[in-house]
Amino acid sequence: MDTKNLIIEAKARFNHNSAKAYLKEKYQTRLIVAEQGGLWRANVETITFLSMAKTDKVILIDSFENPVEVNREELLSKLLETYSTVMKEWHQEWSELEKKR
Amino acid sequence: MSRGAVLFAFNSPKYNYYSMAEFTAKRINHFLGLPVTLITDESSLPEVPNFKFDNIVLVEPDKNNIRDYVVWINKGRYQAYDYSPYDETILLDTDYVVNSDKLLKTFDLDTDFCCHDTTSFLMHPKAPQEVLSAYSFKTLWATVIMFKKTKRAKHIFECLEMVQKNYEHYANIHSFIAGVYRNDYALTLALRIANGHQLLPSDIIPWNLWHVGKNTSAYADSADEFNTEYTVMFDNWQRGKIRKEYINIKDMDFHVMNKESFMELINE
C-alpha cells in the first residue's frame, strides 16, 4: 500500500494531538522496568530520590504499591540508563513530529 | 521453564480467523521469539497452510453466539489453561498486531496472571473507558492475557468457565445485555471472583492496550513482512461531513477492532 498517495487522495490531515498522545503512551511504557522484585517507572521523582538517599539499601513503594527493599545504586543505575535511552528516542521522534507543522 | 503464545481461531462465515492467526503467529515468532499453539477446529484448517504452528489443538467450537447477525465463535477461552503446553503463556486475540518485544515484559511482572484494564484509541486517545454498565465495573480486556501454570491461574480460568456458563445470570446482576457473549465481560467478573471480589494492582498490565477503533483503518507503510510502520486513518464526522485524519506510528503493538481493516492489513 502506497500510504503517501493514500493520504493525498483522501485529503487527510495530520492529527497532531493524537500523534502526541501516541508518542507519550509509547515511551511511557518503555520507561517501565522490572528490577529487584519490584516494578518501577524510570521517572524524575524516583531517580531524584535514589540520587539523594545516602544508604546502600532503601525501601520504595513500587508500581504495584508494594514496599520493596532495593540496592540503591543498582536500581539508580538501571533507571538512569533506561531514562536517558528512552527520553533520547522520544525527543527524536517528537522533533520529527514537530516538523510536520 | 517453557514460554509460548496461544491463539484461538475459528473461521466464521464472514472472516477467515485462521489466516489472521497465521499472520499474528509469524509476528509473535519474529518479535517475541515465542512458539505459538493454535486452538482451532477441523473446518478452519486450510488445505495449504501458510505457517507451521508449534502445536495445533483441535476442539469442537461452541457456535452459540451471534453478533451483527453473524456467528461469532469466541466462547471457550477458558480452555487456554488446559490446552497451553507452556509453563508461562501469552494468550492473544488473533487481531492483535505485534510490532515490538513489549509483551515479553509481562513475564517479568511479579504475578501469575495479568491483563489490561485501560485502553486508548489511536485516533481518540481521551475516549472514556468501557464499563459493564452504569453501576458496574470498568471492563477488563481479554485481548492480551499472560498467565503462568499456578493454582490461582487455574482457578481464574475455572471462574471464567463458570461465568460463561451462567452468563445471563451475571448479565442480570450487572445490568449488561446478555445477547452477545463477551470474553472481556466474563474476564472482568471472573478475575474479581477469583480474587475474593477485588482487583489486585499486580493483575493489571502496567500500560494501556491500544485499539484501532471502528471508524479507523491501519495501513502498512511498506510491503515488508515484518513492517512496523503504519499510517492510521480516521473518519472524523463533523457537521455531517467526513474529515479524514491520520497519524504515523511505528514499533507499537495495537489491537484492530475493525476486522475489514485487519483483513486488508494481512492481505497487503
Where are the language model's segments positioned?
Chain B
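A glycosyltransferase accessory/donor-loop signature
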Residues: 1-7, 18, 38, 51, ...
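A short, glycine/small-residue-rich beta-strand->loop->alpha-helix junction that serves as a flexible
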Residues: 12-21
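Short, acidic, metal-binding catalytic loop of nucleotide-sugar glycosyltransferases
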Residues: 27-34
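Short, polar loop motifs at secondary-structure junctions
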Residues: 39-46, 96-100, 205
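Active-site-proximal specificity loops/subdomain of glycosyltransferases
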Residues: 45-84
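GT-A fold catalytic core of metal-dependent nucleotide-sugar glycosyltransferases
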Residues: 73-124
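Conserved hydrophobic/aromatic beta-strand scaffold that supports enzyme active sites
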Residues: 80, 144-146
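Class I SAM-dependent methyltransferase SAM-binding "motif I" and its flanking Rossmann-like core
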Residues: 115-127, 131, 136-139
